[in-house]
Amino acid sequence: MSSSTLDTFPNPQPERDYEIAISCPEFTSVCPKTGLPDFGEIRITYVPDTRCIELKSLKYYMIEFRNRGIFYETVTNQILDDLVAAIQPRRMTVVGDFSVRGGLKTVVTASYHTKG
C-alpha cells in the first residue's frame, strides 16, 4: 500500500480546527497465519491542516488490503502512516475494530499528533 494511491484536496477551512470522521465498516484483509479472511471496521478521525482525504480514493485504497496477509496491528499502523504521509494532518487517529475471531475481539488504536 502507498500514500501515492490516495488523492487529496485543499482544506476549505484551514484557519480552523475541525474534526473529520470516516468509517469503513466493511474492511477486509487476510490473516497471515491462517490465510482466512479477517473482517472489521476502520475508523479514521483527523483534524486537517492544508489537505483533506478524497473519499473515492480512500475507498479504493482500503480495497487494496482485501487479499493481503497482514496482522491487525500492522494494518492499523500502515493506514495511519499512509494517511499522514498523504495529508500531513494536525492530528489523526485510526482505530481498527476487528470482528470476533476464536472468541477474542481485538481493537487497535494508532495516533499521530504534530509537534508544537
Regions found by a protein language model. Give the residues of each.
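N-terminal intrinsically disordered, cationic/polar leader segments
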Residues: 1-116
